[in-house]
């Protein structure tokens, strides 16, 4: 088995604890750094050197399915796909087949300064875009000149995609062959994104220009920080004890009410032609069982993929987690084409240039479509030949 990051470090203890209850097949775990894992999977496939089982980033599933590296989840294992969040399962569904089993989940919510919102008359950030922006203006006035309301680094695409998903924008057409950035829903989201910078609510800065996110959050340089569940631990360890009652989490806003976000996390796949596939699915079943999900959450802090696990373990007792549970129920899958990571990188390059005055909103949307269409050229040919998933 190949595994990455914190999960790879936790696997020996996780497997040992699971084995104590119900013996599992012997599993040899090879840890991979996240930065090298995607390339390792592709070269492993090309060289016929893949393992039986692997953890994969959810955004890689479409590519691995397209090249024939992974097997669909067999009917006999369909029970592993029950009790899961719909949007996460949808991320694993390509061409009417499900190719991976979600292992743990994440998404992005707002980390906000509870004390500063209370000072301006809000218990939490409002759920509608217009009201939310009005609240940000009040918070910005309260923190004074030189400070902002929200941090949305211009080199990070997740902030724009969150707004786009909240506006129900597709970004890629239904066939996955052309960009849909010029569609009204995305243009509205892009215009709203731009307004946050134009109105001085967000600094025009990349992540590398913020020297210490935690210090800046504590001193009020920004009061809203959209991020994932890993930030809970960072807030608890990097902010002083006396500051712990001054921050909270809230779901994302949307145009007319609660917004959306992309479902993230990792899934487990079994590779095509693996000799020990049946045993591998047994391991997947153990990792997705109630005990496996609880142990993984305790060892890594990851949010369980199985919904029932949220009510039976520490995730249920953590008040900061509630916003993530709410957000996962309204999450929407990102486009599932192998080229998506390159497309979304180009999207953000254009978005940053728009913020710096090179494009209007409509010009930026058209440029995004142009770049997406160029990247999707091969896919259009494959669809025309009936060769895509």
Could you describe each region identified by the protein language model?
Residues 1-14, 32, 158, 334-339:
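Extracytoplasmic "Venus flytrap"
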Residues 1-6, 25-30, 52-53, 99, ...:
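Short, well-ordered beta-strand elements
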Residues 6-26, 347, 365:
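Short, polar/charged alpha-helical segment
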Residues 16-86, 91-93, 118-127, 216, ...:
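Extracytoplasmic "Venus flytrap"/periplasmic binding protein-like
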Residues 58-109, 133, 161, 244-253, ...:
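Hinge/lid segment of periplasmic solute-binding proteins
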Residues 99-103, 108, 133-179, 222:
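Extracytoplasmic/periplasmic solute-binding protein
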Residues 136-138, 178-206:
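Glycine-centered hinge/linker elements that transmit conformational signals in sensory
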Residues 229-244, 254-349, 381-389:
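C-terminal lobe and pocket-closing loops
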